[in-house]
């Protein structure tokens, strides 16, 4: 496992993690590489690509997290929700995905890496309305016009949605009905080698949704 490569990339982005968090991240990357050979969870085929294309922007999200319970929709191979649980193991995290092989992988990671505050649910986000989460995260799940109403049932009344977005963000914002949101901010994320423009959209849904 390229520990030195991971540490150098974290240093580039001024991300500081303690030794236990680094060990959990290494364990996660090892599990993902092993499962990926059999189940094709992600297109990345080497650890360096996983780090650059998936892990780093998930870690950057931490800077914008409010306190409280977190739900991650469309968790897939664990980005960003499982990654955030790995570096904040005391936070309550619920990982949501409709794909059975991906939820099995997420449960295996939670078990092997000792993430006792992680729950995994196999479901579509639109089907869940029993949430009281302080924050919902999403990465490459759906356009904002779909994502905001689709996650409203998961959020506490003052909860926030944090959505990782890329090159099409201006198009998505132009297509977003103003009535859907009460507040919205776009945070430019640090440039990561091998990626295009990335940003984090933080918003609160309108109360009438």
Swiss-Prot record:
Recorded catalytic activity of this chain's protein: guanosine(527) in 16S rRNA + S-adenosyl-L-methionine = N(7)-methylguanosine(527) in 16S rRNA + S-adenosyl-L-homocysteine
Gene Ontology CC terms: cytosol
Residues annotated to bind S-adenosyl-L-methionine: 74, 79, 139
Top-rank EC class of the record's enzyme: transferase
GO molecular function: rRNA (guanine-N7-)-methyltransferase activity
Pfam families from the UniProt entry: GidB (PF02527)
Statement: the UniProt record of this protein carries the keyword ATP-binding: no
UniProt xrefs under InterPro entries: rRNA_ssu_MeTfrase_G (IPR003682), SAM-dependent_MTases_sf (IPR029063)
UniProt cross-references to Gene3D superfamilies, sorted A to Z: Vaccinia Virus protein VP39
PANTHER family: S-ADENOSYL-L-METHIONINE-DEPENDENT METHYLTRANSFERASES SUPERFAMILY PROTEIN
Family: Belongs to the methyltransferase superfamily. RNA methyltransferase RsmG family.
Protein name: Ribosomal RNA small subunit methyltransferase G
Organismal lineage: Bacteria, Pseudomonadati, Pseudomonadota, Gammaproteobacteria, Chromatiales
């Amino acid at each position: 496992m390229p520990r030195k490569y991971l540490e150098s990339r974290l240093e580039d982005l001024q991300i500081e993690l303690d030794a236990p968090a680094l060990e959990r991240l290494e364990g996660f990357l090892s599990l993902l590489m092993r499962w990926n050979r059999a189940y094709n969870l992600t297109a990345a085929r080497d650890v360096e690509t996983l780090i650059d294309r998936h892990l780093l922007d998930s870690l950057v999200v931490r800077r914008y997290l409010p306190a409280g319970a977190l739900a991650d929709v469309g968790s897939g191979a664990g980005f960003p929700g499982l990654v955030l649980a790995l570096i904040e193991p005391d936070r309550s995290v619920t990982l949501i995905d409709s794909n059975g092989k991906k939820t099995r992988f997420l449960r295996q990671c939670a078990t092997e890496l000792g993430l006792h505050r992680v729950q995994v649910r196999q479901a579509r986000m639109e089907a869940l309305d029993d949430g009281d989460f302080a924050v919902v995260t999403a990465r490459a799940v759906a356009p904002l016009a779909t994502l905001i109403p689709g996650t409203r049932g998961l959020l506490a009344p003052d909860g926030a949605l944090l959505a990782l977005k890329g090159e099409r963000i201006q198009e998505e914002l132009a297509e977003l009905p103003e009535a859907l949101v009460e507040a919205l901010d776009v945070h430019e994320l640090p440039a990561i080698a091998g990626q295009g423009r990335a940003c984090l959209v933080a918003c609160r849904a309108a109360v009438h949704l």
